[in-house]
Amino acid sequence: MTSTDQGSWARSEGDSWDIVSSVGYTALGVSAQRAVESERPDALIDDPFAKHFVLAAGEPHLIETITKRDAPQASPFEYLRGMGMRSRFFDEFFLEAAASGITQAVILAAGLDARAHRLAWPAGVTVYELDQPQVLAFKDGVYAQQGAEPTCDRRTVAVDLRDDWPAALKEAGFDAGRPTAWSAEGLLPYLPAAAQELLFERMVELSAPGSRAAIEGPTGTLGMSQFAKVEQKYRSEKDTFGKIDITELFYDEEKTPPVEWFSVRGWSTQGLDMFDLAERYGVRHPEVPEDIRELAGAMHYLTCTLPA
C-alpha cells in the first residue's frame, strides 16, 4: 500500500488518499485507538473490527501499537482516553436516535467506522457511509475476509465530501423527507472554512423536522494553531501516530463554532466537553496539566436537534 512518508501529504485542492496516506491514515490511527480501548478491562466500547483493519493495512507502527503496548499513551487525547469517550458518545447518539424512531443515519467521512456492523440497530434502519472510494474499498475487503455482515441496511456512498455528495446520497436511496441522524466525527479540522460551511448547509437542506446531528467540533475558545501547539508538546513516538504530525493536515482558518452555526438556524443544541464525558462514563483521570485541560475543554461533543 502507499507509504506513510508524510512528506507527500501536503493538503491541496481536490487531494485524495488511501488508508495509509494523508487523511486516510488518520482513520487507521483512530482504528488503532479503538482497538486499544476495546481491549481494556473497563472498555467504553466494543469494536471487534478495529484491530483487523490495522492488521490488514500492515503499517508497522500501528500494529505495534495494538499488539505490544507497554507504556501509557502519550498524546493529550490518548492520555484522557479521548477515543473511548468520543466513540461511546457517538454510539449512544445513534442508538438513541434509532430508538426514537429515526430510521436513516448518515456517517460523514466514515473512515473505518464499524457501527453498521457492531451496533445493535433496530429493524428497518438504513446506515449510509460516505467516504473516499479507496477507504471504503479497503474496509469492505476486511469485512469480506472476516465474513462480517452488517446489523442494519448498510449502504456505502463513495464520494468526496467536497463534491456533490447530496446527489450521490440520494442516488443510494436517501430520503430527505424523513428525519435523519447525522454524524461528523473527527472531520471538521480537515476541512477549510468554506467547506465546513457548505457541509453544514447541505446537512440542513437534507434534514426533515425531527432530524438530529452529532458533531465533534471546536468551541472557538482555542485556535487550531494553539491546539496543534499543545498536541506537539506532548506528542512522542510512543503514541498512536508516532512520528506523524496529524495537525499538519488541519486547516487553521477562522470557522464558526458548530454550536453557534446550528443554534441560529433553529436547531436546539447541547454541548459537552471531554470532562463532561468523563463524568458521564465514570472515567477517572490523574492530575491533568493545565494546558491539556484547556485543550480538552476546547472541543465540544455536540448534539443538535431540528424540532419536529
UniProtKB/Swiss-Prot annotation:
Q: Which domain of life is it from?
A: Bacteria
Q: Which GO terms describe its molecular function?
A: methyltransferase activity
Indicate whether S-adenosyl-L-methionine appears among the record's keywords: yes
Print the keywords alphabetically: Methyltransferase, S-adenosyl-L-methionine, Transferase
**One Pfam family named in its UniProt record:** LCM
The EC number on file is 2.1.1.-
Q: What is this protein's function per UniProt?
A: Exhibits S-adenosyl-L-methionine-dependent methyltransferase activity.
**This chain belongs to which protein, by name?**
Putative S-adenosyl-L-methionine-dependent methyltransferase MAB_4585c
Q: Supply the source organism for this entry.
A: Mycobacteroides abscessus (strain ATCC 19977 / DSM 44196 / CCUG 20993 / CIP 104536 / JCM 13569 / NCTC 13031 / TMC 1543 / L948)
